Amino acid sequence: MIMNEDYVSLEVARLLKEKGFDSHYSTHFYKNNKLECYIEDRKKYWLQKDEYAAPTLYMAQKWLRETKNIHIDVYRNAGGWLYNLTKADNGTLIAEGKSLGPNNGRSSDTYEEVLCAGILYALRRNNHEWRCQIERIDQSVQRNRL
């Protein structure tokens, strides 16, 4: 049985493919908008144009951290689960996410939902926009050191 909450959503899977995620690390994929498991030998299988790798949330989070220098920090407070995006190499805050807990008008309140939302937010951002924002943060840190 596939535990859907452990895997990225179809929307995230599409964006991961667009951003260059290596599908060979994933054992699940979306085909015809349905989450499926690979049956044949993984090394011989290549995703078709309309298929998307569906890695676990952790795999997607790790990929963002290692390839884009973006860490998704999920935490809980009285309002529910939240996320922040930080630079993976030094913890500098890049963006704050919104609370997705029931105290803020949502019906669900899970760590996995918020982690998926953070991954989606990070992937939706324009690469140029990220670079500009990170450069401003780095310049600010350098000024503060002087």
Regions found by a protein language model. Name each.
Residues M1-L146:
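Glycine-rich anion-binding surface patch
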